[in-house]
Amino acid sequence: FSSRESDKVPCRDISIQVDHSTDNFFVTEDDVMDMILSKGDSLKGSPITLIPIGVYERHISANPSVKRAEVYTKHNGVFAVKVYQREPILRVFNSEGQSFYLDVEGSIMPTSKSYTARVPVAMGYISDKLFEMERYNVKTMSASLKDISRLDELFELATFIKTHERWKSQIQQIRVEPNGELTVIPTVGDHHILIGSTDKLELKFKKLHLF
């Protein structure tokens, strides 16, 4: 197509692809279509070259369940969107009953009304609140914030569990004790296992495996 010819090509279709490779369904194709329509513009029939791709890309990426959105147009008049979802690693219930996720990047992620991820759950003496912590990443927390937050150690333990297939299938609950120590609760049996801090996790779980 010459540039003059492509200017005349109308938007004929909208193609949406959501990456579900992590087995998460926080965002569906219908959700993305709703995000597009919420901008209030009628895409179909509009000249494909005049559609503000960046505006739509930023709008979709602003969804708290979206990690990244790629928006582009094709010469045949297709407006295409590919969405990558954030991947939760742990669901946290704080002392006040509020709930949120930690994702694999260490960022706070709100829960969804339509989907619940199958990840370990942390509860107990956790004072962290979503509205206070959502702008932080546990990997870059200051030392003073780590002193009062439990999220950095919970993230470290949840990451360890996720990357070890044996423990990933056996541990679905973590409890923060009044003194800040961590206890894991296996899916089978009626026993609680005190881990303490996250120091030397590899060694602690190796001993647990031998036991």
Map each language-model feature to its residues.
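Charged, solvent-exposed interaction patches on well-folded alpha/beta domains
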Residues: 1-18, 38-47, 51-58, 62, ...
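Extracytoplasmic "Venus flytrap"
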Residues: 22-23
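An acidic helix/loop motif centered on a single conserved Asp/Glu
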Residues: 27-40
